[in-house]
From Swiss-Prot:
Disulfide bonds: none annotated. It is a peripheral membrane protein. Keywords: ATP-binding, Cell inner membrane, Cell membrane, Ion transport, Membrane, Nickel, Nickel transport, Nucleotide-binding, Translocase, Transport. GO terms for molecular function: ABC-type nickel transporter activity; ATP binding; ATP hydrolysis activity; nickel cation binding. This is Nickel import ATP-binding protein NikD. It comes from the Bacteria. CDD domains: ABC_NikE_OppD_transporters (cd03257). It catalyses: Ni(2+)(out) + ATP + H2O = Ni(2+)(in) + ADP + phosphate + H(+). It is found in: Cell inner membrane. Part of the ABC transporter complex NikABCDE involved in nickel import. Responsible for energy coupling to the transport system. GO terms for cellular component: plasma membrane.
Length: 254
């Protein structure tokens, strides 16, 4: 399995250019946070990595490398990169139970799909009464439960990399804390490389090792999390950090 995945000069376009020459490097055992406002190109960059661009959007430049060798997105999806989606309710087939979703995921990747394996993954993400959970349909579960189920399926994939696209969006504070605890636990136990897409600098401060800031389809600043919080350079980065510090009655040093 690769130890590093690199996005090199990725450019995306629809009727007009959307993402301009984005380069990112994911490394095993490290969390790279991709931050920026809505419409900055974060989710499109993830979609390009996985080969699931929306209709009408095409990649016009750039490549993806695994340990320095060019690779297609379809060769990464699932086997090498697991995904935790922004809106878990839309990610599940409403006609299938959690058992069917989990089992089909495992079988598609050639992983064990016995009930003991599925139960262990569900228990690992803190969902009580795994036997009951496996019988549930998506509409019978809360947003927090579905997000934890998404994480359980990412665990089942045993992929060396994870893309987590706004994993705490639209969840209440308690559910958000539980999701962050789970992601932190996965990093400690499995040490994947993680691309964490978020607009929440509190999430960045807690989980990230490195940060890339996007604005208008471009990476405007990159660095380790400590440097970015203590000495942000770009105006967008300074605005994000200042807004985060203001929540605690603090100000960014001039």
């Amino acid at each position: 399995m690769p130890q590093q995945i690199e996005l090199r000069n990725i450019a995306l376009q629809a009727a007009q250019p959307l993402v301009h020459g984005v380069s990112l490097t994911l490394k095993r055992g490290r969390v790279l946070a991709l931050v920026g406002g809505s419409g900055s190109g974060k989710s499109l960059t993830c979609a390009a990595t996985l080969g699931i661009l929306p209709a009408g959007v095409r990649q016009t430049a750039g490549e993806i490398l695994a340990d320095g060798k060019p690779v297609s997105p379809c060769a990464l999806r699932g086997i090498k990169i697991a995904t935790i989606m922004q809106n878990p309710r839309s990610a599940f087939n409403p006609l299938h139970t959690m058992h069917t979703h989990a089992r089909e995921t495992c079988l598609a990747l050639g992983k064990p799909a016995d009930d003991a394996t599925l139960t262990a993954a569900i228990e690992a993400v803190g969902l009580e009464n795994a036997a009951r959970v496996l019988k549930l349909y998506p509409f019978e579960m809360s947003g927090g439960m579905l997000q934890r189920m998404m994480i359980a399926m990412a665990v089942l994939c045993e992929s060396p990399f994870i893309i987590a696209d706004e994993p705490t969006t639209d969840l209440d504070v308690v559910a958000q804390a539980r999701i962050l605890d789970l992601l932190e636990s996965i990093m400690q136990k499995q040490a994947p490389g993680m691309l964490l897409v978020t607009h929440d600098m509190g999430v960045v401060a807690r989980l990230a090792d490195d940060v890339a800031v996007m604005s208008d389809g471009k990476i405007v600043e990159q660095g380790d999390v400590e440097t970015l919080f203590n000495a942000p350079k770009h105006a967008v980065t300074r605005s994000l950090v200042s807004a985060h510090l203001a929540l605690y009655g603090m100000e960014l040093a001039s």
